[in-house]
């Protein structure tokens, strides 16, 4: 067990599309170390002339499926995963020429997004929310863990938590408070979805 916050779970792989992602460092320094993998879209496309973004998503799915996970948790993943990924992990499509990588039960995929449902979807959510607060348009934002679907940040929320803005607070201070909430609810949401897949 390498996840004290989730005693009945084990992280089988930390995969990143950013070489400098801190998650890769933390995984490598874990005792025992957690396996890691890195694959950036740009690198993949350079190494595979003629390949497409969907081919990349398929390759990411293959990396994930080799680990036979019960859940995929996206936290800090900075690439929008399309149907090339989603159809393979939810079983709508099979991996060509490799039955071992094909799933019989859908693997849930959840994502951490630093905003409330239907507010500030996509990248830069914290900055856009803070700017709206500065303009007096909102008094709070929040964090959600949602199921991943084709449309960005539109999947069904698993957990939503409101985080109020504080007058005079810098964006860095707000972001620090927001991250504390993220760390708490990512564990709760992972546990909740795992219990749906593999009840104790």
Q: Across the structure, where does each feature detected by a protein language model lie?
A:
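One-carbon transfer enzymes
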Residues: 1-200
